[in-house]
From Swiss-Prot:
It is found in: Cytoplasm, Cytosol. PROSITE patterns: AMP_BINDING (PS00455). One of its GO terms (cellular component) is cytosol. It comes from Homo sapiens (Human). It comes from the Eukaryota. GO terms for biological process: fatty acid metabolic process; ketone body biosynthetic process; positive regulation of insulin secretion. Pfam families: ACAS_N (PF16177), AMP-binding (PF00501). Transmembrane segments: none annotated. It catalyses: acetoacetate + ATP + CoA = acetoacetyl-CoA + AMP + diphosphate. The keyword Mitochondrion does not apply. This is Acetoacetyl-CoA synthetase. One of its GO terms (molecular function) is ATP binding.
């Protein structure tokens, strides 16, 4: 098996091993590696061998995984993929096959096994939904949708919390061949309309109110304005979520109906039966949206087959998930992690739908659920782990966490110190996996792996079938050095197209304008040639390059945020008219600490010692707020545009849009 040539820095720091795989445990990855070796006559001794085969012979890899995964289909494929086409050609996958995404998620016949656990802030009760009950509910939703005229290709949307209703509505839409899209109640009216108005939905599901952070938030006024901005809607289904229907007034929302009445329209004397439209592998399943922090969100169309087979690969092989697992992913329906989570049902595992704050009534709320339910896998944001560390929480002392074997972190790079915190203060025997990908591929390029050690500060490995490299500006792969994250070969989970992008120009500009024919993901990373692990260095559109030294903002954050005086930070470039660049670091001070010259000096010294003199920011300034997206990601690009004097279209994508004004007309930034 040929391997990449890896010229470059071999003097990578020896990484600290935090976890090692159990050599006695026969994982699904091990079984797949053995099956491939037997079927293809290959000696695949390690994950590294399997990975390199999977990207060099990617057509064979996906064919073998199709068999291994047990995908349910009504017609087998004629061809896996045309290997003469590159990733920029967006080749069709598994041509000729017919299947249904929802059928694959609802195929498990142990009817009394729990599929969903529903937990909500402020409610003690945990509601259980079995696979049989889920099938019955999806059948009701689908029958009512068909009755009102929803058909293949129509758009059905949810403006919903993370609840069973969102899962049921999505699976019903998928069973028909309609296209699902969703946003969460924390989106404002503009943010919702920026997204949904582009795709002209026929049907919307929503709720009358939600509870978050100890408060009830009425949703009806926002819903009313959203409906007004969506002229193609034929029906608005309102789900009583906090109040009973007697206390909800629908009179101001045209074509509105309560959920019970909507479901009743599809029933007759006999309960409706589930029907699954048999559709091409490439049939659209989801429309996902980019963050919209610098303009109108892009509408990415993801196929049913591509999403299914990619998610199965991640859950079965990389996550070693089985039907005995229970996963809690702290997410909203407006984030791709929700879609990723729901696909877990295809493995027969159960998932916990939690709606509410992860810090109310106490920061232990998720750990309480882990113990009460017996959760085996917890998926959360890197930021939440940092918050727990700041609050000195020690679940290892307060909770048993007996069944928990995996914690996955996503949303932003996981800091090296967070690895130490998790293994010291949460559980020493778990696999801590940092996973990274994006909405663009509705999945991961790299992530967790039960076949490999966990090294402090590194994502374990590139995922099977994902031909990922770090490239320099000249388009050459670099090892042990910072580079642009690229994918060089076709993958079934890339968008089939963008909605309303007939000539494909937006699609090409988004991924293929930097390196022709090669997917540039917009992230900056470094691949360790010794361990194969990856360090994410931030968005490449936020890459810093003062005096010809390229580095990612997270390299600065990792140092700065170890200072107890600093609550948060933001690092962006500023350019003058000659396109010369300097680095500006903004600090948000922790409560009880003042911005002082001594702190600035200590931070400069720490960056100089930890990185180099050329990494030291030109200016370090105080700010009262750091802008974040609704999904908890720092917004560097919009701030970069503001300090350059450019207008920023907010796109309703910010959790705290008022903070953007803090970066306008800063005196210290004038005259550069």
């Amino acid at each position: 098996m040929s391997k990449e040539e890896r010229p470059g820095r071999e003097e990578i720091l020896e990484c600290q091993v935090m976890w090692e795989p159990d050599s006695k445990k026969n994982t699904q990855m091990d079984r797949f590696r053995a099956a491939v070796g037997a079927a293809c006559g290959l000696a695949l001794e390690s994950y590294d061998d399997l990975y390199h085969w999977s990207v060099e012979s990617y057509s064979d890899f996906w064919a073998e995984f199709w068999k291994f995964s047990g995908i349910v289909f009504s017609r087998v494929y004629d061809e896996v993929v045309d290997t003469s086409k590159g990733i920029a050609d967006v080749p069709e996958w598994f041509k000729g096959s017919r299947l249904n995404y929802a059928e694959n998620l609802l195929r498990h016949k142990e009817n009394d096994r729990v599929a969903l656990y529903i937990a909500r802030e402020g409610k003690e009760e945990i509601v259980k939904v079995t696979f049989e009950e889920l099938r019955q509910e999806v059948a009701l939703f689908a029958a009512a949708m068909r009755k009102m005229g929803v058909k293949k290709g129509d758009r059905v949307v949810g403006y919903l919390p993370n609840s069973e209703h969102a899962v049921e509505a999505m699976l019903a839409a998928a069973s028909i061949g309609a296209i699902w899209s969703s946003t969460s109640p924390d989106f404002g009216v503009n943010g919702v309309l920026d997204r949904f108005s582009q795709i002209q939905p026929k049907l919307i599901f929503s709720v009358e109110a939600v509870v978050y952070n100890g408060k009830e938030h009425n949703h009806m006024e926002k819903l009313q304005q959203v409906v007004k901005g969506l002229p193609d809607l034929k029906k608005v289904v309102v789900i009583p979520y906090v109040s009973s229907r007697e206390n909800i007034d629908l009179s101001k929302i045209p074509n509105s109906v309560f959920l019970d009445d909507f479901l009743a329209t599809g029933t007759s004397e006999q309960a409706p039966q589930l029907e699954f439209e048999q559709l091409p592998f490439s049939h659209p399943l989801f429309i996902m949206f980019s963050s919209g922090t610098t303009g109108a969100p892009k509408c990415m169309v993801h196929s049913a087959g591509g999403t299914l087979i990619q998610h199965l690969k991640e859950h079965l092989l990389h996550g070693n998930m089985t039907s005995s697992d229970i996963l809690l992913c702290y997410t909203t329906v407006g984030w791709m992690m929700w879609n990723w989570m729901v696909s877990l049902l295809a493995t027969g595992a159960a998932m916990v739908l939690y709606d509410g704050s992860p810090l109310v009534p106490t920061p232990n709320v998720l750990w309480d659920l882990v113990d009460r339910i017996g959760i085996t896998v917890l998926v959360t944001g890197a930021k939440w782990l940092s918050v727990l560390e700041e609050k000195a929480m020690k679940p290892v002392e307060t909770h048993s966490l007996q069944m928990l074997h995996t914690i996955l972190s996503t949303g932003s790079p996981l800091k090296a110190q967070s690895y130490e915190y998790v293994y010291r203060c949460i559980k020493s025997s778990i696999l801590l996996g940092s996973i990274s990908g994006g909405t663009d591929i509705i999945s991961c390029f790299m992530g967790h792996n039960f076949s490999l050690p966990v090294y402090k500060g590194e994502i374990q490995a590139r995922n099977l079938g994902m031909a990922v490299e770090a490239w320099n500006e000249e388009g050459k792969a670099v090892w042990g050095e910072s580079g642009e994250l690229v994918c060089t070969k076709p993958i079934p989970c890339q968008p089939t197209h963008f909605w309303n992008d007939e000539n494909g120009n937006k699609y090409r500009k988004a991924y293929f304008s930097k390196f022709p024919g090669i997917w540039a993901h917009g992230d900056y990373c470094r691949i360790n040639p010794k361990t194969g692990g990856i360090v994410m260095l931030g968005r490449s559109d936020g890459t810093l390059n003062p005096n010809g030294v390229r580095f990612g903002s997270s390299e600065i954050y990792n140092i700065v945020e170890s200072f107890e005086e600093v609550e948060d930070s933001l690092c962006v470039p500023q350019y003058n008219k000659y396109r010369e660049e300097r680095v500006i670091l903004f600090l948000k001070m922790a409560s009880g600490h003042a911005f002082q010259p001594d702190l600035v000096k200590r931070i400069r010294d720490a960056i100089r010692m930890g990185l180099s003199a050329r990494h030291v920011p030109s200016l370090i300034l105080e700010t009262k707020g750091i802008p974040y997206t609704l999904n908890g990601k720092k917004v560097e690009v919009a701030v970069k545009q503001i300090i350059a004097g450019k207008a920023v279209e907010q796109g309703g994508a910010f959790s705290n849009p008022e903070t953007l004004d803090l970066y306008r007309d800063i005196p210290e930034l004038q005259g550069f």
